Amino acid sequence: MSHISADDVRKVAKLARLNLPDDKIATYTGQLESILGYVSQLEQVDTTGVPETTRAVEVTNVTRQDGVDPTPVREEILNQAPQREGDFFRVPKILAD
């Protein structure tokens, strides 16, 4: 594992367009070293025979067969309306003239 310097932290912050105050440099230096140490451990894991993937759990779409369902008759639907005007539902007016 390589050592992370304060200049490395400043460079990463600049590349990420982060305004990093000088009093936080030491904190972030330690945190970046810790992260890279963990990545170094992961690099040593033998993954021979493990298929490549982009996620831990596979995502599948739940689908159903398309089918034609009978459509209710318009007159049956309109007859259930509290108020009706011809072939339309009558609803209270909500917009001013």
From Swiss-Prot:
> Has keyword Metal-binding?
no
State a single Pfam family of this protein: GatC
- UniProt keyword list: ATP-binding, Ligase, Nucleotide-binding, Protein biosynthesis
Q: Which InterPro entries match?
A: Asp/Glu-ADT_sf_sub_c (IPR036113), GatC (IPR003837)
EC assignment: 6.3.5.-
Q: Which SUPFAM superfamilies match?
A: Glu-tRNAGln amidotransferase C subunit
Query: Per the database entry, which stretches of residues form a coiled coil?
Result: none
**Superkingdom of origin:** Bacteria
Reaction(s) the record says it catalyses: L-glutamyl-tRNA(Gln) + L-glutamine + ATP + H2O = L-glutaminyl-tRNA(Gln) + L-glutamate + ADP + phosphate + H(+); L-aspartyl-tRNA(Asn) + L-glutamine + ATP + H2O = L-asparaginyl-tRNA(Asn) + L-glutamate + ADP + phosphate + 2 H(+)
GO BP annotations listed: glutaminyl-tRNAGln biosynthesis via transamidation; regulation of translational fidelity; translation
What functional role does this protein have?
A: Allows the formation of correctly charged Asn-tRNA(Asn) or Gln-tRNA(Gln) through the transamidation of misacylated Asp-tRNA(Asn) or Glu-tRNA(Gln) in organisms which lack either or both of asparaginyl-tRNA or glutaminyl-tRNA synthetases. The reaction takes place in the presence of glutamine and ATP through an activated phospho-Asp-tRNA(Asn) or phospho-Glu-tRNA(Gln).
Question: Which family is it part of?
Answer: Belongs to the GatC family.
Q: What is this protein called?
A: Aspartyl/glutamyl-tRNA(Asn/Gln) amidotransferase subunit C
Q: In the UniProt record, what gene is named as encoding this protein?
A: gatC
